[in-house]
């Protein structure tokens, strides 16, 4: 039984100290102890990220969790991450998101050579913020190089040219909410 609710404006400290009897806290605790289960929540995103990390831990060499979703495209779907967990990132975080995306996409889809792109304002190698350039460089120097197509512009996210689209959480969340708004137009 749960007797507490995580509110949308609860701080991380409040969530950790005062919401131990909430459905998010209890559900993730249950999921940790029952590995054949999953957990879905429409609740407070910050609570979900913090409590997931607390209860589930992180994969070795991965610093931060990322929110991902399947985005429909002209061919099938693309996996996009991060969609809001990390407002600020560095190039190494983008590499880690690419690794997580590659692993997850490979489980969902038996495609052996998924195409990976970084969401950016242009496809040219010299465009975009420093962390995007750094992320592209790190991905190009990793085992993912053979799958990396470079940068993808927002207007091509639904084209199907990339199977995995990497972004910082701020930009990814704006992209997601813009698409949701347009689909309701």
Q: Which ranges hold each PLM region?
A:
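Alpha-helical scaffold segments in soluble metabolic enzymes
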Residues: 26-30, 51, 93-107, 134, ...
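Short glycine/serine/threonine-rich phosphate/pyrophosphate-binding segments
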Residues: 21-28, 32, 38-52, 63-68, ...
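Structural motif
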Residues: 22, 37-39, 46-47, 77-80, ...
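Phosphate/nucleotide-donor binding subsite
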Residues: 1-36
């Amino acid at each position: 039984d749960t007797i507490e609710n995580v509110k949308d404006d609860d701080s991380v400290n409040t969530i950790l100290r005062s919401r131990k009897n909430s459905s998010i806290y209890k559900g993730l605790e249950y999921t940790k102890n029952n590995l054949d289960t999953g957990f879905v929540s429409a609740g407070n995103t910050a609570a979900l990220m913090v409590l997931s990390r607390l209860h589930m831990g992180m994969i070795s060499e991965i610093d931060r969790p990322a929110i991902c979703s399947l985005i429909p495209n002209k061919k099938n779907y693309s996996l996009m991450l991060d969609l809001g967990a990390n407002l600020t990132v560095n190039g190494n975080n983008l590499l880690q998101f690419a690794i997580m995306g590659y692993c997850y996409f490979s489980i969902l889809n038996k495609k052996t050579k998924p195409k990976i792109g970084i969401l950016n304002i242009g496809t040219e190698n010299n465009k975009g913020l420093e962390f995007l350039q750094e992320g592209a460089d790190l991905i190009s120097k990793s085992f993912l190089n053979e799958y990396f197509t470079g940068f993808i512009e927002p207007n091509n996210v639904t084209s199907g040219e990339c199977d995995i689209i990497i972004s910082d959480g701020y930009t990814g969340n704006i992209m997601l909410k813009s698409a949701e708004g347009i689909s309701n137009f």
